[in-house]
A protein has these predicted regions:
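N-terminal low-structure segments adjacent to metalloprotease catalytic domains
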Residues: 1-79, 305-313, 318-329
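Auxiliary, metal-adjacent structural segments of Zn-dependent hydrolase domains
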Residues: 84-140
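Pan-zinc metallopeptidase signature
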Residues: 217, 225-307, 311-314, 318, ...
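Second-shell loop/turn segments in exported
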Residues: 89-100, 153, 161, 198-204
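Active-site recognition of the HExxH zinc-binding catalytic motif
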Residues: 160-181
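Short pre-active-site segment immediately N-terminal to the catalytic Zn-binding motif
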Residues: 148-166
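Post-HEXXH active-site segment of zinc metalloproteases
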Residues: 176-205
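Metalloprotease/metallohydrolase-associated module, dominated by Zn2+-dependent proteases
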Residues: 1-25, 195-260
């Protein structure tokens, strides 16, 4: 069992399996349905928009999945879930409190960034924390939210902020155009400074459009008074060891967002005028100088150790997200 589980873990992530099964519409409370689905699902029957390498990876370990799922079902995992896990999860959710006006303000800011464009209907609603360094979002609102993410003491100890997660994940509901993604690829192909840092970010399972979301989350949180300027700087410095070099540039210019302009439109305008091949390093230095004043723009060793991995890493390779040019974590 462990050998097969290790093989599965080396190829796919739990979120991929959860998201695939949620697309089936099958019951998550019926072990037989789960076992049957992963043993027999036809990749060609899936909607074209969700197909990709992540589906092929799941198919490559189908035999191992079938074996492990059958053994879990035979061992009574469904009963364990209902009697031990679900009550704990439900209690954590019921005990969590947030003021309705705070949620309303967050939603208003996200809507403003949408600039009249519709938000992705499959936006993140519920959040899973597999371990302290890997929080990720799932598509299906009927999945659980673990006590770790909501527990105040754990949040203080590991610098986990559920509302930051909430804002960050819901910003992934903003759509970006193919034109902007092409601009991002052109930048990667033609700017050495950006490409070097982007390759490092990808080694963390991030990169791509993640810098846009990091910048937007800090912008929204700062506008709402949830954080101060130092916290903006800290996030830029330590998120994936400071490799998302577009984040401070985007953050610097977000106050120039025009009335009614979408986030996509703003970013395309920014790429046209500021974020151009050969100019990223100078723009990054200017943005960091504005954020940091005289403080150096490289993270200290202590800062890097504190949060080399962001506490709200995303589920990798779920079906293509409108705000990702490639699967991210």
């Amino acid at each position: 069992f462990l050998d097969r589980a290790h093989r599965i873990d080396s190829v796919v992530r739990p979120s991929q399996l959860c998201n695939l099964y949620s697309l089936s519409g099958g019951s998550k409370d019926d072990p037989e349905q789960v076992v049957e689905f992963f043993a027999s699902f036809d990749p060609e029957s899936l909607p074209q928009k969700v197909r990709g390498a992540w589906i092929d990876e799941i198919c490559s370990v189908r035999d191992e999945l079938s074996y492990c799922l059958q053994r879990l079902a035979q061992a009574g995992y469904a009963q364990y879930w209902q009697e031990q896990v679900r009550p704990c999860l439900n209690n954590a959710i019921e005990q969590y409190r947030i003021a309705p006006e705070q949620l309303g303000a967050i939603h208003q800011e996200i809507t403003r960034l949408a600039g009249g464009q519709p938000l992705d209907a499959t936006g993140s609603r519920i959040y899973i924390l597999g371990n302290i360094d890997n929080a990720f979002a799932l598509l299906d609102e009927t999945f659980c939210c673990t006590p770790l993410l909501l527990d105040p003491e754990t949040a203080r100890q590991y610098r986990i902020d559920f509302m930051q997660v909430y804002i960050h994940e819901n910003l992934h509901r903003l759509s970006l155009s193919g034109e902007l993604l092409d601009m991002l690829q052109t930048l990667y192909d033609n700017d050495d400074f950006y490409r070097t840092h982007e390759d490092r970010a990808r080694a963390y399972g991030e990169g791509g459009n993640e810098a846009f979301v990091v910048a937007a989350e800090r912008y929204v949180s700062r506008r709402l008074g949830r954080i101060d300027d130092k916290q903006v700087l800290d996030e830029v410095l330590v998120y994936c060891a400071g490799t998302l070099v577009l984040a401070p540039i985007v953050y610097r210019y977000l106050p120039d967002l025009r009335n009614g302009e979408s986030f996509d439109g703003f970013l395309r305008r920014l790429f046209d005028r500021r974020i151009r091949p050969g100019k990223v390093e100078s723009q990054y230095r200017r943005a960091m100088k504005k954020l940091a004043g005289t403080r150096k723009s490289e993270p200290t060793a202590a800062e890097t150790r504190a949060r080399t991995h962001t506490p709200y890493r995303h589920a990798a390779a779920r079906h293509p997200h409108p705000l990702r040019s490639r699967p991210g974590r």
